[in-house]
Amino acid sequence: MKRSALAGMLLALVLVAACGRGQATARTTVRFWGLGREGEVVRELVPEFEKRHPEIHVEVQQIPFTAAHEKLLTAYVGDATPDAAQLGNTWVPEFVSLRALEPLDARIARSAVVRGDSFPGVWDTNVIDGKTWGLPWYVDTRLLFYRTDLVAATGAHWPPRSWGEWREAMVRIKQRGGRGRFAILLPIDEYEQPVIFGLQNGAGLLAGGGRHGAFRDPRFRQAMAFYLDLYTSGLAPGLDRQSIANLYQQFAEGYFAMVITGPWNLGEFRNRLPPEMQDRWATAPLPPPEEGMPYPGASLAGGSSLVLFRRARASEAAWQWLQYLAEPAQQARFYQLSGDLPARPSAWRLAGLAADPRAASFLVQLEHVAPTPKVPEWERIATRVAECAEQVMRGGRDLDAALAALDADVDRILEKRRWLLDRSAEETERRP
């Protein structure tokens, strides 16, 4: 009898242990790919999520930014995409065109994610063909970093409310600085500046639903002319990124008084400028083309979004993870870990950013940002824009000829897109 009771107890213990092991192995694993440093620090947010959701385990794979695009495409071709990932905003259209992503509208409608608690232009980067394909995770945009002492010495109206006021301030800075000194640094091989000026001036960049280039549009031509005048007038040096020896040292030495750059340089300026320079720099939103236009002028809607892959094996659990990352408290914590600006304005208050005057300029600017054209070919087109500007600046072509050639190049890049769109339209017309 005792042996029978003992055997029964042992059997019960074995069954309990087996059940425990079964419960442990029953956890759902979410495979998440993070890019660059974000892929490292996001791991710090996993323990709290798993504490809330003990049935879910998050497996984070960090991928270097330099290899991320190719790795994501390779994973798509090989049917090996993760459940969810971080995706640069300009990459979203490409993966939508591949049918690699799941639209999120139905999920968002049932969740605590609030579209109103976002920067409209940033949210819009994820909306393609009327559907939402990603949740903004962190944001960036570009505005002015400037030397307060050099600007104040000119007596110019600041911050400028138009391109004209801005140029007048730059002329005064150049006059005071003399030979070998410049008002602004604008690396000639960057596409962002001419595109920003074009968007501010109402240029669409592409026409026909993204079928053709529209860089000969008078609004873009005017923007490009303003941009190139900064070089021909000697207000900006004709340097590309490789020719800039040390941006922070040259800024401190007064080689240039201002630069258009992004939030990553908030930390860099604090860390790399000498102590005596720390009270001599500030940030300001970009001016619009004309006084009386909405202030500030538009800038680019950058950053990264959180996407769910169509072939996700654990889509429900992955959506729980993405919602968690989008919470204001987690975005504020992620800012503390990474320095990336939160995509939800409510998180700025939690992170203390709204009280920082240098960061506050970004808060103002982010309410006035616009996405680049939502076509998979955009990055190739952007490279052509920078090449076009450099050709004109170096005297290789006049502006009108360069813009005509740019439109021709862009039309060639978009040839396959035109064919696909036209074919889709024909098939739609043939349907009964």
Residue ranges of model-derived segments:
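Long, aromatic- and glycine/proline-rich binding clefts that accommodate carbohydrate-like moieties
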Residues: 125, 281-286, 335-387, 391, ...
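Extracytoplasmic/periplasmic solute-binding protein
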Residues: 129-137, 142, 167-213, 256
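Extracytoplasmic "Venus flytrap"/periplasmic binding protein-like
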Residues: 48-118, 152-161, 250, 254-258, ...
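Short, solvent-exposed loop/beta-turn-alpha elements that line the ligand-binding surface or hinge
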Residues: 105-118, 183-184, 203-222, 271-276, ...
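A structural signal for short loop-to-beta-strand junctions that line the ligand-binding cleft
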Residues: 74, 82-83, 111-150, 182-183, ...
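Extracytoplasmic/periplasmic substrate-recognition and gating elements
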Residues: 154, 225, 229-237, 246, ...
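Glycine-centered hinge/linker elements that transmit conformational signals in sensory
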Residues: 169-172, 210-240, 286-289
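Hinge/lid segment of periplasmic solute-binding proteins
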Residues: 89-143, 167, 196, 278-286, ...
